[in-house]
Amino acid sequence: MKTNSIRRFIDKIKPNFTEGGKFAWLQSTFEAFETFAFTPNRVTKSGCHVRDAIDLKRTMIMVVIALVPAMLFGMWNIGYQTALHSTDWPYPLDGCHNVAALLYCLWFGFLRMLPMLAVSYIVGLSIEFAFAQIRHHEVNEGFLVTGFIIPMIVPVTTPLWQLALAVAFAVIIGKEVFGGTGMNFLNPALVARAFLFFAYPTRMSGDNVWIAADLWGTDAITGATPLGELAAGIRPTASALDMFIGTIPGSTCETSVIAIALGATLLLVTGIASWRIMLSVILGGGLMGLTFNVLSTLNLPQLSTLNPQLSTYIQLPFYYHYLMGGFAFGAVFMATDPVTAAQTNIGKWIYGLLIGIFAVMLRVINPAYPEGMMLAILLMNCFAPLIDHCVIARNIRMRQKRALVTSKASAK
C-alpha cells in the first residue's frame, strides 16, 4: 500500500519535471530519485541487446552489500582498538561472550564512521547532480559504491574537510572530466586516496594510525601497523591469525581478510567481479613474495642499497603480504572495477598479475611508502587499455593467419 502511494505521488508530480514543466531544469534530479525508488519502465530503442535481470543500479547495490561485512568489522575494530588503549572504556574486553562490549565497540565505530559516510555521499552526490543538470544527462548509480568505499580506505581520523576535498577531486578530476560513470580510466576511490596521500602525506603514510588513548579521543596515541613495523625494520608483532581476522591497526575497513572474503564470495557467485583478476592478483603477489624469499637466501649486498630495511621485508613469508595493508581489499574491490580494469580474458590475467607483482615490489623496495597496492592498481589502470589493445591485435593477427592458411588450402 505504501509503495502504491509513493508511486501515485511520483506520477502526480512528474509532469512538473518533464519538458515544458515548471521544473523541467531539474529533470535529471527527479529521474535520479524516481529510478532509485522504482525500476524505470524505459527500454532500449535500437540495436540488439541481451536481456539481463541485473541493471547498473542492482549491480551497484550488490557491490555495496558485498562491502557491508568489511564495513561492520571495520566499525567494530575502531572501537576495539580504542578500547585496548583507553583508560575509561566502560566494558571489559574479556572475550567474545561479552555481548555488551562487542555492541559498544560496534556503536563507537559507527559514530566515527557515520560523519565520514555522510560527507562522502553529500559532497559526491552534490557534484554528480550538478554535472547531470549541466549536461542534461541522467544521474548514474556509480557513486553508490565510490561514496561507500572512500571512507573505508582512509584513516578514521581523517578530517572531514580533507575527506570532502578528496571526494570532490575524485568525482571531478577522476571521473566527470572524462565523461562520468563508465568513461573514467582511473578508479575514483583510489584517486581520492591518492589525493590525500600526496596532499597530506603525514596522515596517509601507511605506517602509523591513530588509536584513542581515552574514550572520546581527546588525548591520542599512534599505533604502528604491520607494514609500518616492517618499514622500520621490525618484524610484525601481530600474528598471522590476528592479521587474518583483522584485529590490528590499519585503514578503517581494510584489515579483516575474513570479512573481505565474504564480500568476494558474493561478488563471484553473482558474477559481478572477475575471478580471473582476483586470482591473478593473488598469484602475482605470491610470485613476487616468493621471489624476494629466494633473494633473501643469496645475501646480495646490492639489495640493501634499495631499502635499508630490505632484509626484514624479503625474509617475510610471502603469504603475509595477503594479510597486511590493503592487498586483500584492493584485489577484491578495487582491481576488479569493470570500468578501469582490462576487458579481455587474457588481458585480465596480465592486468591482475602485474598488480600483484607491483604491489609487493613497491612495498619492499620503496622505503618512503610502506603500502603499494594503491599505486599498483592506479598504474595498471593506466595500462589496461594498452593491454587490451595488444591482446586484441594479437587475436586479429592470429585470425588473419588462419584465414590465409585456409584460403591457400582451398586454392589447392
Feature locations, PLM:
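Long hydrophobic alpha-helical segments that form multi-pass transmembrane helix bundles
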Residues: 179-261
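N-terminal signal-anchor module of multipass membrane proteins
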Residues: 1-117, 410-412
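Structural signature of hydrophobic alpha-helical transmembrane segments
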Residues: 106-120, 157-166, 229, 243, ...
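Generic transmembrane alpha-helix motif of multi-pass integral membrane proteins
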Residues: 146-156, 261-267, 329-335
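Short, basic, low-complexity termini and linkers enriched in Ser/Thr/Gly/Pro
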Residues: 297, 302-312
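Central hydrophobic cores of alpha-helical transmembrane segments in multi-pass inner-membrane proteins
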Residues: 97, 116-130, 147, 167-175
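C-terminal ends of transmembrane helices
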Residues: 44-50, 124-135, 172-182, 262-270, ...
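Loop-to-transmembrane alpha-helix initiation sites
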Residues: 164, 185-190, 319-325, 348, ...
